[in-house]
A protein has these predicted regions:
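Histidine-/acidic-rich catalytic cores in large beta-rich domains
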Residues: 1-267
């Protein structure tokens, strides 16, 4: 979908941080850089439909994904990670047809991203969900974290099937079993450990890069399918709480969480 008009609903200049906003509309094939007044200052045309996220690198290049047709029929699927310069030229790319949602460029030039792997039904460990709702491909898709170097060689991998405490975090009773838990963010911290968000079970967890085990975890049903947890310089974690599927009125919030107390310090 291409936006018909950019604009600003409300702009309090004294409270807003002066910056640009990178806007990648789902379902489209463009990515836009927007100023504080809502004016488009830069547009990239992608070589296919947008996968999901986009981000600007320190060198000004755009890191983004587009969809491939070979992956499972999920949303939001990507499959093709691209680094595009200011002139629109592709200067790096990597294809993994099971890539989805989030990705990060590391200080060493490597790229970490979320992917899936299909676990056959008879081998899958699944708690909760709707029995018989496994994916038509023949099993359940579990999340995988992968890191590739500039040549596209995989140098590190974390597999959900090897480390995730399934018995502790069952799927909600009405959830299909075609995919387990729906990871949507992988934020790489300065120490290399990775903060991951699983939307369908309202869980965020910090994964130890060396052992693969959880160093810290927090779950709160009131988040209603969170996105984008990130660690601040003070150690706190911000996230976007979608607030969907709530008992009461649905509403979204931005939260700042003290990970030591597991308490909301700001919203």
């Amino acid at each position: 979908m291409r936006p018909l008009k950019f604009g600003v609903t409300e702009f309090n200049q004294s409270l807003a941080f002066p910056s640009f906003t990178l806007f990648a509309p789902s379902g489209g094939s463009q990515c836009f850089l927007i100023d504080m007044l809502g004016e488009c200052r830069k547009e990239w045309t992608l070589p296919g439909p947008l996968g999901n996220y986009g981000q600007l690198l320190p060198n000004g290049n755009l890191l983004i994904t587009v969809r491939t047709s070979e992956g499972p029929k999920f949303n939001p699927i990507g499959g093709h990670i691209l680094e595009i310069d200011w002139d629109g030229d592709i200067i790096w790319e990597h294809i993994d047809h099971l890539q989805h949602h989030d990705f990060n460029r590391l200080p060493n030039g490597n790229t970490t991203y979320l992917s899936w792997e299909l676990i056959p039904t008879e081998d899958a460990e699944v708690i909760g969900g709707v029995a018989g709702s496994e994916h038509p491909d023949g099993g359940i898709y579990y999340d995988v974290l992968r890191e590739v170097n500039a040549d596209g060689d995989m140098v590190w991998e974390w597999r959900m099937v090897d480390h995730f405490p399934f018995e502790k975090y069952p799927l909600r009773p009405a959830r299909p079993r075609e995919e387990y838990a729906h990871a949507n963010c992988c934020f790489v911290q300065p120490d290399g450990n990775i903060l991951v968000s699983w939307r369908d079970i309202d869980l965020i967890a910090l994964i130890d890069r060396k052992s693969g085990e959880f160093l810290w975890e927090m779950q709160d049903r009131r988040w209603g399918g969170q996105h984008d947890p990130r660690q601040l310089d003070n150690g706190n974690i911000t996230l976007f709480a979608n607030g969907s599927e709530q008992v009461g009125p649905e509403y979204s919030r931005v939260l700042e969480i003290d990970p030591n107390k597991k308490e909301i310090g700001w919203s």
